[in-house]
Amino acid sequence: MEFNSEVKKATNSIYKKISDIMPEIEWSTHAPYIYEINKLKKEKNAVLLAHNYQTPEIYHGISDFSADSLALAVEAAKTKADIIVMCGVHFMAETAKLMSPNKKVLLPDMLAGCSLSSSITGEDVRNLKKKYPGVPVVSYVNTSADVKAETDVCCTSANAVKIVDSLGVKKVIFLPDDYLAKYVATQTDVEIISWKGTCEVHEQFNDREINEIRKNNPGIKVIAHPECPPDVINASDFTGSTSGMIKYVKENQPEKVMMVTECSMSDNVQVDNPKVKFIKPCNLCPHMKRITLPKILDCLKNETNEILMSKETIEKARKSVERMTEIGR
């Protein structure tokens, strides 16, 4: 595809926004796709939803709405578009389908999975419910529709503590992220029965890395995602969901900050906070990085990679997500 004068003119305002983090030679390879995608989505009445971990050319270049998992689910439920293209991973596209079952939901790469989602099955949940009869199941939204169908209420990292406390019980089964479960347990009096799932990005971080960053950057603020190991949480100044981390930077405007999460998010937040210096520990999510501009254009143009589920699964799984969105943040 050609980076001609028409493409350059149409995408120039976008590039101005992200030029500090992307050289023009790289932009010239992205701009033709951005131009075509933005034109095509209007023709097809499509909406592009992007998770905070998407790369800047997607996050700032083509997405109509960029957010964390909770906000993406809410947006999917209320969109007036005919087609939803989920620039994220498979469970996010499934969740969009649950919230808008009559919409066509597309995922640019069907192999964009998640280590948390793949760590547990619906059968695993049924076995846990037999082992702990009567104990409500809270599942992280990073799970398959089959798991959500066996779940009482879903949660995200933004509202996990609120969800658990809202149930008014002494004990819950919390799935599948063991580190998030440990974090929630420190914030509530409810007993947490956890599962041994982990995020392959966040589990790589450790407190030694943080201490070294602090040593080389006096005064830096370290903010971590609750999917990180406990030693990382304890070594950080703030712990929060991706939306919480974005809010922290926006409101506090620290001189320097280290965001202990997926690397692309720091790039995206840096664009909107140019006065803040970001020290970036670059752990990338290989699943999120399967989503690229060429794949987005192809799936939108040909309407391929549609998310399909049985009516029974949608009806069962949707209840747990709707309950989550009703409780909110």
Q: What kind of feature is each model-predicted range?
A:
Residues E2-M259, C263-R329:
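Active-site loop-to-helix "anion-binding N-cap" substructures in soluble metabolic enzymes
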